[in-house]
């Protein structure tokens, strides 16, 4: 039946009624889909004050597809019970029945059946009772007959847990006569043509009013992944603080820049194959600044610059090994080395946000590839107090004001600190970053002046993104299992920059 015919039927029924009509009841009387009546109601609403329609919501219980089947044929446990003959049935054969697995466990819990494991041909199932009442089928038949109110809350809850029953919200319209009610519908014009204007016929024709609340068609456009949205926000914070972005295009790095230049010994556990991806081809880096390499070698093996070094036989072959960088601190080392070659020294503030790679076991919170955020400040006479001040400013811009600092160890920073923030949701202090002052054994071989200090800190990009978007499994954020609809629906990233009251104890 066309929409116009349904609308005419609705108007005639409404004219004959005293107060109004319910759209669902009208659909049942006319023997048509409720949605067809709803479409007619909306068409009449568009004509102006012909009708008034009030949206109403009612909840009722409906059987699921499995519930309908059980209401007809009986529950799984009842079917299992009926399938067991007096001499019993092999458990393996029973499990092959369509209702075997579910019905067996339910029938056992109801104590309708038992298992005899001493049978010669394997476990055998026997009836315990002569007959049983299929309460599940009886309850579902009550619901199907419109008597769901006879079931208790506990009974309905059990049926819902078994996915046999569902609570459905039905939206209907209560339709009544409007101020301009009429049973005859005149077609409204939607366009004003030149012919109407020239002939003047527009004066006698009804026009459909503009709907200024209607939504237009959304234009197709690209959508940023949540990780990129948070990355953009972090980048903006660094730029607001006067930082310059470092080049980070060296995904493949030599062990020299990734480890040795950072005063990390060649026997350090982090350089093991269990933690690092080494390259097979090209296996070695051929171009290294050899004068700088010699100074690094001397610092490692003999000491210098006020340090005893590590006192071991430093090997160039080990330093040449290519790898996928394990941190962006290698990019910081390259940037500081370039800075040291410029005379005179100029204070700088650098930052980087890019991918790093670790040979780690994959789980809900760890991937072999992730993003590292790093900030570096180089100036004369910087101290631990400067580092704490910069960290407080940085994290305040992220909306994190409750900070604690804990002493830690890093091969290339001394002193070193872990940064903790109080997580309101978890109700505990969680680590949000690592920081420290670069060691002289790292800076002086580069050629930086002795009175220059470099403070640095870093954190991952994935952790704050997961917290921001309520994601518990990192594989829902990155990888081939990512739901593209999540990327489409995710709102803009707006980090909470509203400062909260400071903690009672700021440092520990």
Curated annotation (Swiss-Prot):
L-phenylalanine binds at residues 329, 372-374, 412, 438. The keyword Phosphoprotein applies. Pfam families: PheRS_DBD1, PheRS_DBD2, PheRS_DBD3, tRNA-synt_2d. One of its GO terms (molecular function) is ATP binding. Mg(2+) binds at residue 414. It is an enzyme of class 6 (ligase). GO terms for cellular component: cytoplasm; cytosol; membrane; phenylalanine-tRNA ligase complex. This is Phenylalanine--tRNA ligase alpha subunit.
